[in-house]
């Protein structure tokens, strides 16, 4: 639809559901649902969430040609702290590897029109350093689960950010 013109439409959501069915991802990342951010971001987050639900349903006429697919986990990210969900504790992902930081920085720099308006790259790297310090690592990003995380055993829980 164009920058700042993305509308929540059933056609968009169904198309995204079709992509999820075709690609069969286990984990899907989407922009957070908080409205205190660019309108395209929260709208896309809502459509991805709804598409994940539609992808697992069998009854939609437009999706009948492909088998249903249920993702394992939907995680939201926020571009700015203002868009962080307030009622969900984040999962912190270690992104300290210099190759990851370089690729992430390059991906952010590709959004030239947006990084000119505000120094989003430095904002994200500063947030990553702060979250990393909180977790005792170099850099971390916060992801917010749509649903409770399920672990097969307590042994899979390696540590918390607090590191009691």
Tell what function each PLM region has:
Residues 1-3:
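A conserved beta-strand->alpha-helix junction
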Residues 7-164:
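Metal-dependent de-N-acetylase/amidase catalytic core
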């Amino acid at each position: 639809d164009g920058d700042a013109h993305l509308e929540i439409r059933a056609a968009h959501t169904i198309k995204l559901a079709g992509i999820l069915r075709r690609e069969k991802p286990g984990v899907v990342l989407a922009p957070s649902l908080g409205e205190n951010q660019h309108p395209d971001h929260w709208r896309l987050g809502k459509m991805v969430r709804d598409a994940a639900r539609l992808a697992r349903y069998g009854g939609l006429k437009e999706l009948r040609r492909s088998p249903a697919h249920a993702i394992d986990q939907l995680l939201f990210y926020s571009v700015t702290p203002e868009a962080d969900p307030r009622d969900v504790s984040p999962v912190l992902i270690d992104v300290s590897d210099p190759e990851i930081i370089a690729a992430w920085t390059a991906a952010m720099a590709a959004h030239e029109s947006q990084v000119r308006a505000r120094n989003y790259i430095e904002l994200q790297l500063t947030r990553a350093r702060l979250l990393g310090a909180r977790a005792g690592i170099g850099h971390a990003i916060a992801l917010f689960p749509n649903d409770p995380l399920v672990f097969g055993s307590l042994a899979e829980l390696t540590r918390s950010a607090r590191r009691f």
